């Protein structure tokens, strides 16, 4: 990072006159990073950014040097970086989930195994609180190589227009049949009371994520499911077929827009905001944002013009909902950049300290008196200004948000909508979110690293075509056979080979632990007997 401080030049001049033993007495170690640039070259380059940088360095005890990578070609940037062994950063920030490039590099020893470090709560009080289930998706060959940028595990679910439901006398849906009845009523029973047939129950665009959520209601799992000791892709289960048959009925009965496959993803949620749809199946914070829109744009309830329209952030249906991977992006510690264990500890300490409360405030809100002020009741009040001009712009890309803000120190006063979302996560979605048991094994599969995108696309397109009636059951089966022949069967074999090895290791660990406990019990009994004899 190019930082131009007048003081730096003065310090350098003074250092030249000091004794060698004193010259570097206060010099901080440097941590180097590769970070994606989302802000057109403005990240940590705005007015006031130098102050932000200095605050980070003073707080963490480390200087830091960032190479910003073009987000539009970031995968290529990472690939090039991994080949430049002489200029390797200590920390590489990655987006999304692991791909073949990262897996291949990990298998060649490009990254440190962080398993033991992330168990050390004394050295890393924040990072050690990471959800161990989430780490399974960042594991290659039994080694945890990534630190996740945490996202809510129970983020997906079902939300709907509460005032529409009230007008039509509908209760809270619990079963799949309840959902169908609500979709039907929202489509055909004039929920907005305008005497015009202009609504569809379920909002849909070409983004098909809602279908994955619906599938969990039927018990078919999340991508893969464990059956009889084997991991099986969900499209090979009876429950999957039941789920897409139900979705086909929803489509055939006109309960979603007939042209949903042509509606661009950028329009997602606009149907609910504009009063064209009443059910939103996606991230729960998306339902909250629709509710925010109603409040901010004075959209009135259809049952009470003195109140705003509202969304019920329900969450699961039939006691289930889809889990996220638990993260969106991650950090790698490279073996060529962090050459020693001391380097690894420095890199992890830097990342850990960035998750302290003061650093979260700096990353999220910037400088007090410049971009925010504290209110008398201890809440943050932001100061108006262009987000792209904020001095902290881009700093949040280095924050894992583990464990995030303490519940008793939330910087923004929660609204009714915020409280409803928190309640949904804590009491409803998080406890029942269905995880993908194959997540860790997919990242280590050679077939998936090469052909995963194509294989996923075959299944997704076949599902869409079947729901819309473009293909029949035979066409659906043909697509599944195509999936199997183009690498699907190999993928199943690789995933289950890794799964079986993992199960054997876990069983061996359990046996060792049991033997250790038994030996300790016998030793204690022997000591007690000896003591009594004496």
List the predicted regions and their residue ranges.
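Conserved small-residue motifs centered on glycine
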Residues: 36, 349-465, 470
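Conserved N-terminal structural module of periplasmic/extracytoplasmic solute-binding proteins
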Residues: 7-8, 21-178, 212-213, 223-226, ...
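Helix-loop-helix "hinge/cap" segment bordering the ligand-binding cleft or interdomain interface
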Residues: 139-209, 224-271, 280, 333-348, ...
């Amino acid at each position: 990072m190019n930082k131009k401080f007048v003081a730096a030049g003065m310090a350098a001049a003074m250092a030249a006159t000091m004794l060698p033993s004193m010259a570097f007495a206060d010099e901080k170690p440097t941590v180097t990073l590769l970070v994606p640039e989302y802000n057109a070259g403005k990240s940590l380059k705005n007015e006031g950014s130098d102050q932000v940088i200095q605050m980070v360095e003073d707080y963490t005890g480390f200087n830091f040097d960032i190479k910003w990578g073009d987000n539009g070609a970031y995968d290529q940037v990472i690939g090039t970086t991994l080949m430049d062994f002489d200029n390797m950063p200590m920390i590489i920030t990655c987006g999304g989930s692991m791909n073949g490039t990262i897996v291949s590099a990990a298998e060649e020893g490009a990254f440190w195994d962080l398993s033991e470090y992330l168990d050390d709560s004394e050295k890393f009080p924040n990072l050690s609180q990471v959800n161990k289930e989430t780490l399974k998706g960042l594991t290659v060959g039994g080694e945890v190589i990534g630190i996740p940028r945490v996202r809510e595990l129970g983020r997906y679910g079902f939300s709907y227009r509460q005032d529409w439901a009230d007008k039509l006398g509908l209760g809270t849906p619990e079963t799949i049949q309840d959902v169908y009845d609500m979709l039907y009523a929202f489509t055909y029973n004039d929920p907005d009371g305008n005497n015009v047939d202009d609504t569809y129950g379920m909002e849909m665009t070409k983004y098909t994520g809602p279908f994955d959520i619906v599938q969990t209601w039927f018990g078919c799992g999340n991508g893969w499911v464990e059956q009889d000791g084997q991991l099986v892709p969900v499209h090979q289960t009876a429950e999957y077929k039941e789920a897409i048959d139900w979705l086909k009925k929803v489509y055939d009965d006109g309960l979603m827009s007939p042209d949903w496959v042509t509606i661009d993803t950028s329009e997602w949620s606009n149907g609910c905001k504009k009063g064209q749809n009443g059910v939103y199946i996606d991230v729960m914070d998306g339902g909250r944002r629709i509710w925010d829109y109603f409040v901010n744009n004075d959209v009135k309830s259809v049952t009470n013009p003195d109140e705003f329209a509202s969304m019920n952030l329900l969450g699961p249906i039939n006691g289930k909902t889809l889990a996220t991977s638990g993260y969106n992006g991650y950090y790698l510690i490279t073996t060529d950049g962090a050459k020693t264990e001391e380097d690894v500890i420095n890199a992890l300490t830097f990342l850990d300290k960035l998750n302290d409360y003061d650093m979260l405030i700096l990353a999220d809100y910037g400088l007090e008196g410049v971009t925010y002020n504290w209110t008398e009741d201890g809440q943050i009040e932001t100061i108006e200004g262009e987000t792209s001009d904020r001095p902290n712009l881009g700093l949040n890309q280095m924050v894992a948000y583990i464990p995030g803000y303490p519940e008793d120190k939330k910087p923004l006063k929660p609204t009714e909508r915020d409280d409803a979302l928190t309640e949904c996560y804590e009491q409803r979605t998080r406890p029942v979110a269905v995880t993908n048991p194959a997540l860790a094994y997919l990242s280590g599969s050679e077939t998936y690293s090469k052909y995963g995108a194509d294989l996923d696309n075959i299944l997704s397109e076949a599902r869409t075509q079947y729901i819309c009636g473009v293909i029949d059951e035979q066409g659906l089966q043909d697509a599944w056979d195509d999936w199997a022949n183009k690498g699907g069967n190999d993928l199943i074999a690789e995933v289950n080979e890794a799964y079986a090895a993992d199960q054997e290791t876990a069983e061996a660990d359990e046996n060792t632990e049991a033997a250790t406990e038994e030996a300790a019990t016998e030793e204690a009994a022997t000591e007690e007997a000896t003591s009594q004899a004496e």
